[in-house]
């Protein structure tokens, strides 16, 4: 806020004096907001002047206020439409949304496709048993979700039928098969999802773009596990919601997925540990970074990148410039029939459009039949400084090329050099020179 106000005065006659004055005004305004911010409280009995429901406190709060919630079980669907902080008691604060749409809905939809709410904090709360998402944030900016337990939501899902009850498809355009997963950021930017546990929902964490552009979010240090019908963490470019009046996807991009554990997801529904999807014409999922995660024992591929819109279909698809670096892959499953691999796979990139700018580096693989699968009509995949296992390190299933130089092939002799060495299948894979020892010390794996 302060730099914007200062910059506005640069063209004035005395820029430094006016710029300083503008900053003083901004600081004064900000100080007034802080001084006027209130702290409200909630406890089950309503003692000490507290509310008995979270909703009552949220409705009474003003922008900048904090709502402190005592331990207890609160049976409600909390809707947040302004800048407030919702602080629980280290997960002993439980929102039980049985029979309700969501546990918490951060709702900026009135301004879609722009963000209609910002600066919302939700921390230390258990959210369970919602029909759809446990926590849904739509058309929002600068949201912080920290230290929450999101467990056992998506109750309306009929997995065998691929339907999700009365989910509002006017803005959730592609969630019938998972009810929106446990925690869903839709049209959200510059937000942080930190140190949450997301478990036993249909899917884990979903980042999508139905109601506006979705980007510059950080998803870090979360434990995402046993969400058995879908992926652990998903970045997906979907069709735009009708309420936006748009015809093309807004796009997902420049998100960081770091230092999470994604484990045991998709075991019944062929979900990946991490999914990056730009499935249809005009969809965009670009510039994302998947770094330093533990991705293990998921029902499908460790990281799946998919596009199913073949050129010359217009408008074009952008699934480029994503980076997968420093992760550990172990014991994941094969990719699904739409982008098949022949066995358990660490990373699979499947695209019917050209792929460029995607890099895979400093990853370690074990208990995978295929470490990296690649299928694209053109383009090049860059794969360097990885420690491969003893199976197929690179499976090139398309006409694109793979620069797989400077990797450790599980032996000093390089690909196929002995029975312990990793191998290559397919053509168009460059492997020499290679590393004569592992890139990552075994103690760091």
Question: In which residue ranges do the predicted regions lie?
Answer:
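Extracellular beta-strand-rich solenoid/capping regions of secreted or surface-exposed proteins
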Residues: 55, 59-63, 74-87, 94-143, ...
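Functionally critical loop-and-helix segments that line ligand-binding/catalytic clefts
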Residues: 337, 342, 385, 395-445
């Amino acid at each position: 806020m302060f730099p914007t106000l200062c910059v506005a005065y640069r063209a004035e006659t005395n820029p430094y004096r006016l710029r300083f004055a503008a900053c003083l005004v901004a600081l004064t305004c900000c100080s007034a907001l802080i001084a006027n911010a209130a702290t409200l409280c909630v406890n089950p009995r309503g003692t000490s002047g507290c509310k008995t429901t979270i909703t009552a406190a949220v409705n009474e709060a003003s922008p900048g206020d904090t709502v402190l919630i005592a331990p207890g079980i609160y049976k409600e669907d909390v809707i947040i439409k302004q800048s407030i902080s919702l602080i629980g008691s280290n997960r002993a604060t439980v929102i039980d949304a049985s029979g309700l749409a969501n546990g918490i809905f951060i709702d900026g939809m009135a301004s879609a496709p722009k963000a209609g709410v910002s600066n919302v904090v939700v921390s230390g709360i258990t959210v369970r048993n919602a029909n759809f998402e446990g926590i849904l944030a739509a058309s929002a900016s600068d949201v912080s979700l920290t230290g929450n337990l999101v467990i056992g939501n998506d109750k309306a899902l009929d997995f065998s039928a691929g339907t999700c009850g009365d989910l509002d498809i006017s803005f959730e355009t592609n969630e019938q098969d998972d009810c929106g997963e446990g925690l869903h950021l839709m049209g959200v930017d510059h937000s942080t999802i930190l140190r949450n546990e997301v478990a036993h929902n249909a899917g884990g964490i979903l980042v999508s773009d139905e109601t506006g552009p979705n980007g510059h979010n950080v998803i870090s240090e979360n434990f995402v596990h046993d969400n058995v019908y879908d992926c652990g963490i998903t970045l997906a470019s979907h069709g735009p919601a009708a309420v936006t009046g748009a015809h093309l996807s807004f796009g997902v991009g420049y998100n960081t997925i770091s230092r999470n554990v994604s484990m045991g997801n998709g075991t019944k529904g062929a979900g990946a540990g991490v999914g990056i999807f730009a499935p249809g014409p005009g969809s965009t999922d670009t510039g994302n970074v998947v770094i330093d995660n533990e991705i293990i024992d998921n029902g499908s591929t460790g990281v799946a990148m998919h596009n199913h819109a073949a050129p010359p279909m217009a408008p074009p698809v952008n699934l480029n410039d994503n980076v997968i670096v420093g992760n550990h892959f172990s014991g994941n499953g094969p990719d699904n029939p739409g982008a098949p691999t022949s066995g358990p796979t660490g990373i699979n990139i499947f695209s019917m459009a050209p792929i460029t700018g995607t890099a895979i580096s400093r990853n370690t693989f074990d208990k995978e039949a295929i470490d990296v699968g690649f299928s694209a009509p053109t383009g090049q995949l860059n794969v360097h400084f990885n420690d491969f296992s003893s199976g197929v390190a690179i499976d090139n299933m398309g006409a694109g090329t793979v620069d797989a130089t400077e990797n450790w092939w599980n032996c000093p002799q390089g690909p196929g050099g002995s029975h312990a060495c990793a191998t290559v299948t397919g053509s168009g894979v460059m492997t020499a020179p290679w590393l004569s020892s592992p890139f990552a010390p075994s103690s760091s794996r």
